[in-house]
């Protein structure tokens, strides 16, 4: 019983330490971290379970590292003039001296952990445009219109969004995997001229107690500093799932911070759009779901969109397909997602490679030169043993520069269709439809 009390005491003190750490009372936080380490060490001494020992050791190392970081920061601060720790502009001394400070000096005054978080979040800003245009997204016409309404129009025509007409602040894209939710986000990043943050759960969740909610707060602070920002959160259910008795304190704190920031309590959230994607919308916390004013179902593509997807994925790869072939493939792939069609085409594109690999006979043909299509040159290509021009050989006998690979045919696609199956079943789709009827709207 004694060792349990030691551990409970250590946890109690380290929670106080993280609270002081969050409040930027670093001296008190350092003292409490050191005190908690003494209790953790004592608990470790009396712990009999090897598994529990390993957990305690890992936590002890984490809090020791944080204590050392704080000590290093406090030692440096002793040699500097008083400043607002973390750049708090409301501090009178910080305001008096802040006017002439450079960005470099601000970085030096910032707590090392705050600076580290800032740098980490800065890497999530999309600086290179993904080069995905609206037209590159097959189908999803309604979803694209909603996103233009929420993102493009408020930036291009700000005079239209005054008074009671406000742009949407939260949009949730949900649907089966591989239907284009993240691809739509790339199109938004390409089309807008404002700052685009692309966040995944790994950018937010850290091993440090109290650090994750700090990252959430800092993310929104950075977004407010930039004029007109979009925060895209992929797999948002990993961060904001329904609350239950089994979830950790850290997960609960992350959700609470998201709710505070998305609600704009005590902060101006104008000019920030939170765009999120999830495959399991029913798993989201109810309060988080309410923050997303628009909940758009990104369902499976319709036949016209599927035909366009086949064309996009095949692209410039040599092929013999015509419009009727694309329509036939679209009709045969009912229930396939965009990702499934991508996998199917990828397999079909490999069929000519397999034909070369398995061929026992090749023939000589005349075809436009790769270097200069206006010039005809001799190549060899696989053929059936019964072809009048067939010569018995394998791919090992061929000069690589003389090989002419077969073009992709409708037969290749049909062959791959027998192998590549859809990844979503009817039961899954029924659940999405039920959620859409209750809480969302169709984006197709």
Swiss-Prot record:
It is an enzyme of class 3 (hydrolase). Signal peptide: none annotated. It comes from Dictyostelium discoideum (Social amoeba). One of its GO terms (molecular function) is ATP binding. One of its GO terms (biological process) is endosomal transport. Keywords: ATP-binding, Endosome, Hydrolase, Membrane, Nucleotide-binding, Protein transport, Transport. CDD domains: MIT_VPS4, RecA-like_VPS4. It is a peripheral membrane protein. This is Vacuolar protein sorting-associated protein 4. Transmembrane segments: none annotated. Residues 79-122 are annotated as: Disordered.
């Amino acid at each position: 019983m004694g060792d349990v009390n030691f551990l409970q005491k250590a946890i109690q003190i380290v929670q106080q330490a993280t609270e002081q750490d969050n409040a930027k009372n670093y001296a008190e936080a350092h003292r409490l971290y050191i005190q908690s380490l003494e209790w953790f060490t004592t608990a470790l001494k009396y712990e009999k379970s090897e598994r529990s020992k390993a957990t305690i050791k890992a936590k002890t190392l984490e809090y020791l590292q944080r204590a050392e970081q704080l000590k290093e920061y406090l030692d440096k601060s002793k040699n500097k003039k008083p400043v607002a720790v973390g750049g708090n502009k409301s501090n009178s001394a910080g305001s008096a001296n802040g006017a002439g400070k450079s960005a470099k000096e601000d970085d030096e005054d910032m707590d090392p952990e705050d600076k580290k978080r800032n740098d980490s979040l800065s890497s999530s800003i999309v600086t290179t445009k993904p080069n995905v245009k609206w037209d590159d997204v097959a189908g999803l016409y309604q979803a694209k219109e909603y996103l233009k309404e929420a993102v493009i129009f408020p930036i291009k025509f700000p005079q239209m969004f005054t008074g009671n007409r406000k742009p949407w602040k939260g949009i949730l894209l949900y649907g089966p995997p591989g239907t284009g939710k993240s691809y739509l986000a790339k199109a938004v990043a390409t089309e807008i001229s404002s700052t685009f943050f692309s966040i995944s759960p790994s950018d937010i969740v850290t091993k440090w107690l109290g650090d994750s909610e700090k990252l959430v707060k800092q993310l929104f602070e950075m977004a407010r500093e930039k004029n007109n920002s979009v925060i895209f959160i992929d797999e948002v259910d990993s961060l904001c799932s329904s609350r239950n008795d089994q979830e950790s304190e850290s997960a609960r704190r992350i959700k609470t911070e998201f709710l505070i920031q998305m609600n704009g309590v005590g902060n101006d959230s104008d000019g920030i759009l939170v765009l999120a994607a999830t495959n399991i919308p029913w798993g989201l916390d109810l309060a988080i779901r309410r923050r997303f004013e628009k909940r758009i179902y990104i369902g499976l593509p319709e036949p016209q969109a599927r035909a366009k997807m086949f064309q996009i994925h095949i692209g410039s790869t040599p092929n013999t397909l015509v419009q009727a072939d694309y329509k036939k493939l679209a009709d045969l792939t009912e229930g396939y997602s965009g990702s499934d069609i991508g996998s199917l085409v990828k397999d079909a594109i490999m069929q000519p490679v397999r034909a070369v690999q398995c061929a026992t006979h090749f023939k000589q043909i005349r075809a436009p030169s790769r270097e200069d299509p206006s010039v005809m040159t001799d190549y060899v290509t696989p053929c059936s043993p019964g072809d009048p021009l067939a010569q018995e050989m394998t791919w090992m006998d061929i000069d690589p520069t003389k090989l002419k690979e077969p073009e992709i045919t409708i037969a290749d696609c049909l062959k791959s269709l027998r192998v590549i199956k859809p990844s979503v079943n009817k039961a899954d789709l029924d659940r999405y439809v039920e959620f859409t009827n209750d809480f969302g709207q169709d984006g197709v």
